[in-house]
């Protein structure tokens, strides 16, 4: 296994990149297809650790699927109803929140004991608000180690009814409830307590459910109404959009060291909120062009911003490293407390690693300020087993300074060939070229 990867200075990035499938869309689509009536063919499926964990779990639960040799398309024979285990079993889900949370809800509709567990970091990622909500609907759930955290033992029992869920930590809790509730015996009315974070991810969920035949009524995202005893219906074919979070690194690279980069597989009508990252780059000075199936970014002089980033929590990390190249002082990212419950505590991790390359950083409870130095320092960047840390800090090589990424394999969670794709668009700086 490769312990580290040193990226030498990059003079220019240019070209077109066809994005890998979206992680958020891939795992939602797999779960809905598995429970739908009929066979679904998913294309442009993401091949990554998170998706492999979901596929393995579905296979253990008796779902039949046929995966293409390149793992980018998959035919799933739907069960025509809720997931079910024939006997007690344990599902290992790695650090895949997009598998853990929805499966925890989905498996409350069947009677066998099912244990959900994962990597050590998964056992540090809170799930208590989801468990509380499921218990309100009758689910029997036990914590096997620490209260409010995986591993969990699920023993069915969810009926429906009036449910209140805290929306302030993770939108994945609401996503999990929304996707399972139509299959419950009774109607569900789901009320949101607190501010709903990452609302665009709920839009992804609602769009996917609609593609599988179920429309959800809601009162301005505060109360959701779901009819129990419903059936998901396969759309036959479903094209997984390119991953908008993954697009952010290449669009930012173009803004810093373009040329022009075009990312294809997403566009102006994407269901993913992270396409709004392009608007943030534009507000920093970059030139953005939109098509139905692409977003294009060209280099411009970048300046600082002060902005609420709650709507694009994953892509906002890319803004933190893009800020190293912005003129005019300090960039401030606000309302990002949910960074702390991701693959690592991303606020602390980002602050720590930005300081290594010479930035002055203030880490607040829910905000980050970044003031770049005149010249970046060469550094060895810790990645905390977090794919997005590795990909964000690759942008440091767009300076006249090399950067070393520790544990580069962590990108396999969502983008296994990220570094090869970046290299293919890059022109290396010659040893004597100006920055």
UniProtKB/Swiss-Prot annotation:
Active site: 314 (proton acceptor)
Pathway, per record: Metabolic intermediate biosynthesis; chorismate biosynthesis; chorismate from D-erythrose 4-phosphate and phosphoenolpyruvate: step 6/7
Broad class of the protein's primary localization: cytoplasm
Matches recorded under SUPFAM superfamilies: EPT/RTPC-like (SSF55205)
Enzyme class: transferase
Chain sites annotated for binding 3-phosphoshikimate: 23-24, 28, 170-172, 198, 314, 338, 342
Example GO biological process: aromatic amino acid family biosynthetic process
InterPro entries: Enolpyruvate_Tfrase_dom, Enolpyruvate_Tfrase_sf, EPSP_synthase, EPSP_synthase_CS, RNA3'P_cycl/enolpyr_Trfase_a/b
Residues annotated as binding phosphoenolpyruvate: 23, 97, 125, 172, 346, 388, 413
Catalytic activity: 3-phosphoshikimate + phosphoenolpyruvate = 5-O-(1-carboxyvinyl)-3-phosphoshikimate + phosphate
Record carries keyword Acetylation: no
Quaternary data: Monomer.
Similarity remark: Belongs to the EPSP synthase family.
Role: Catalyzes the transfer of the enolpyruvyl moiety of phosphoenolpyruvate (PEP) to the 5-hydroxyl of shikimate-3-phosphate (S3P) to produce enolpyruvyl shikimate-3-phosphate and inorganic phosphate.
Protein name: 3-phosphoshikimate 1-carboxyvinyltransferase
């Amino acid at each position: 296994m490769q312990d580290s990867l040193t990226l030498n200075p990059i003079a220019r990035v240019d070209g077109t990149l066809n994005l890998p499938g979206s992680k958020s869309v891939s795992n939602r689509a797999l779960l809905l297809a598995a429970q739908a009536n009929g066979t679904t063919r998913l294309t442009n499926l993401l091949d990554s650790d998170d998706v492999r964990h979901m596929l393995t779990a579905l296979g253990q639960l008796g779902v039949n699927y046929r995966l293409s040799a390149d793992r980018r398309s998959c035919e799933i024979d739907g069960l025509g109803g809720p997931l079910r285990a024939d006997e007690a079993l344990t599902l290992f889900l790695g650090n895949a929140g997009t598998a853990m949370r929805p499966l925890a809800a989905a498996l409350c509709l069947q009677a066998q004991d099912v244990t959900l567990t994962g990597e050590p970091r998964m056992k540090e990622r809170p799930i208590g608000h989801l468990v509380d909500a499921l218990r309100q609907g009758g689910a029997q759930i036990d914590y096997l180690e620490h209260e409010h955290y995986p591993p969990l033992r699920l023993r069915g029992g969810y009926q429906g009814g009036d449910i209140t869920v805290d929306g302030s930590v993770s939108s994945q809790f609401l996503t999990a409830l929304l996707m399972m509730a139509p299959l419950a015996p009774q109607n569900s009315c789901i009320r949101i307590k607190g501010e709903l974070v990452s609302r665009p991810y709920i839009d992804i969920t609602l769009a996917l459910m609609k593609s599988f035949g179920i429309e959800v009524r809601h009162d301005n995202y505060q109360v959701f109404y779901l009819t129990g005893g419903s059936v998901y219906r396969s759309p036959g074919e479903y094209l997984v959009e390119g991953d908008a979070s993954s697009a952010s690194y290449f669009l930012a690279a173009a803004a810093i060291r373009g040329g022009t980069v075009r990312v294809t597989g997403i566009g102006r009508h994407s269901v993913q909120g992270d396409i709004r990252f392009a608007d943030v780059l534009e507000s920093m000075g970059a030139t953005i062009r939109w098509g139905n199936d692409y977003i294009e970014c060209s280099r411009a002089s970048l300046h600082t911003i002060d902005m609420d980033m709650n709507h694009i929590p994953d892509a906002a990390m890319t803004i933190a490293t893009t800020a190293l190249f912005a003129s005019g002082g300090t960039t401030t990212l606000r309302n990002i407390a949910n960074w702390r419950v991701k693959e690592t505590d991303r606020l602390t991790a980002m602050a720590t690693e930005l300081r290594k390359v010479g930035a002055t950083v203030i880490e607040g409870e829910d905000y980050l300020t970044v003031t770049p130095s005149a010249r970046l320092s060469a550094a060895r960047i810790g990645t905390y087993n977090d794919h997005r840390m590795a990909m964000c800090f690759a942008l440091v090589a767009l300076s006249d300074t090399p950067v070393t990424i520790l544990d580069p394999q962590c990108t396999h969670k969502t983008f296994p060939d990220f570094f090869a794709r970046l290299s293919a668009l890059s022109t290396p700086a010659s040893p004597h070229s100006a920055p």
